[in-house]
Amino acid sequence: MTDARRAFCTITVLAAVVVATAASTAAQRDGADKKPSLSLKATPPAGFAPLRVRAAVDVRGGANDYAEFYCATVQWDWDDGTISENSEDCDPYEAGKSSIKRRYSADHTFRLSGDYRVTFRLKQKDKVIASTTTTLTVRPGAAEGF
């Protein structure tokens, strides 16, 4: 193999490595910047009043250090006139080091029958950054109305 041919092959291989590395880095960056999604489940989804429900939210996908989700205020709207909200005291956010919370849960008792839309919200200050809703049914219980 001539020196010119060897140099051409070396340059071609190096160019392929650079392109592959750039594509891999872009793919990682795209996944890291992706907003996580929320999944809400209420257990049990139906029952008799008074009904105690456990609502759980899983935060799926996206970056583990997604800045908007870090140290967010959590709000549960139970659709019965009750709203629960809490915030945590967190360390300052550091990209690549801080981790978002991946699971939230809360219990609530529904005293009256009806169909309820339970809504979970993640907020930064007064801005809702993500939310999800589920519906549950509470049937009249023996003690309701007495």
Which ranges hold each PLM region?
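Extracellular/lumenal mature domains of secreted and surface-exposed proteins
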Residues: 2-3, 23-146
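Bacterial N-terminal signal peptides that target proteins for export
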Residues: 2-12
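Bacterial N-terminal signal peptides
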Residues: 10-20
